[in-house]
């Protein structure tokens, strides 16, 4: 990660060589595996406040601000840092629809956001509490007597996905297909794989829209068919863009958080014990784990030349919004690389759900799901650990998360010490 040599290609002429770090951030984080977030924290000591990398997966070079202050400034200035063209999906298909409202700037953005806000209010989420608990308990029932499980497949994927599909009124029986599409769409480094899955998703959504147009129901797509923007019905492209956004946002983010949170608890039995002894602390633990293991990266396009610190960004430059770097900023959080469930989250709010006009509309639902999952696992299962002869696998492409996470716990009558097993597998 040393400054790159003065080479005219592939680095833009306006990027000073001392600000260039010649690596792919997502690939490097993935290679770091379980040490990814510790490595990310070191970037606050080893890189300039804003640096430039020549590649990001299959995406071109981008500026990477690492300070929370700079990232907040960027997110609060959509006129200079635009969300238009944030994702590559429609472009890969040779189409022109937008993920609304994610890829739309103010003031137009507010019109689309207003369509989604009523679906995710605290009151609406509160009404789901018992359904969320029921589903979590059912999934725990399926594994509790086994003594181990593939946590991703047994819980982290089906739990939030089934809740979300129920909320949207989408077919529950298609869950495995939806999960495959979103996982390969968001986490693949292969451009053809991303293109193929984007095409599959758009085909399903268009078919679903046509079916609901002919046979309206009490579901999200039917709701959009009766909604209006500026006194007119939504266009087919607008319907597609909103459904596509809801599809990928609702089917992966909580899954990714659950994998990272439970990996942490499995690796840190003392903090697992802390929450078992004081369940009232779980809400604070969720906030601290959201901060410590943020999962979302976004991009912005510079619309005009702008100066931030010593850096001059030119019109057309890309800027990476890295929530993990913002939330590991030592200027904001003391001992930022340390997970502390008693940290005062309210004193220094994290940016796990982004910031500004594009802040995550589903944050209330996500928090509720994460809290209930942790409460019930800690209440119903004995101390769990990383399963013997398994190694958790981490992926940092797009939305960060665990590719594989096998957990194990002692069944009644098993005299083996969980602590000694944890030590042996660490």
How does the language model describe each region?
Residues 1-426:
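Cytochrome P450
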